[in-house]
């Protein structure tokens, strides 16, 4: 099974890359966790933000192949407990399609991305910094895998 985090934003601090890779490498080879970065469009004082978000959304969707699952991370998505995420991970594994977890830029996801989403997931009702979200997703996917595999990491 292949899980991809498609996220707007690049050139993250080293601690973000290290945190992401720490959890990605802990997963078994049959559960590949990949990161695809979409460059954040420059937002100037007079920028047409709606157009920039639409362009970022198009770039995100261009990374998704037909038939792949899209799961958007949204403030108004469904909150999952660790056990619920483990259940979703197991269903995704049985479905055998690539799963694309979509994280938008500072203003969120393009409506076109949300419209293609099969599931909407909320990490928290809090506003979280995007660099931290990457690590949090990696850790939670790893934790969900440990629940499914009986690993003692999740106690």
Swiss-Prot record:
CDD domains in alphabetical order: RlmH-like
EC number: 2.1.1.177
GO cellular component: cytoplasm
Keywords in alphabetical order: Cytoplasm, Methyltransferase, rRNA processing, S-adenosyl-L-methionine, Transferase
Broad class of enzyme this protein falls into: transferase
GO molecular function: rRNA (pseudouridine-N3-)-methyltransferase activity
Positions contributing to S-adenosyl-L-methionine binding: 73, 104, 123-128
Localization per Swiss-Prot or TrEMBL: Cytoplasm
Endpoints of the signal sequence: none
Ubl conjugation listed as a keyword: no
Family, similarity comment: Belongs to the RNA methyltransferase RlmH family.
Physiological role: Specifically methylates the pseudouridine at position 1915 (m3Psi1915) in 23S rRNA.
PANTHER family linked: METHYLTRANSFERASE (PTHR33603), RIBOSOMAL RNA LARGE SUBUNIT METHYLTRANSFERASE H (PTHR33603:SF1)
NCBIfam families linked to this entry: PRK00103.1-4, tRNA_RlmH_YbeA
Subunit structure: Homodimer.
Protein name per Swiss-Prot or TrEMBL: Ribosomal RNA large subunit methyltransferase H
Species in which this protein is naturally found: Pseudomonas entomophila (strain L48)
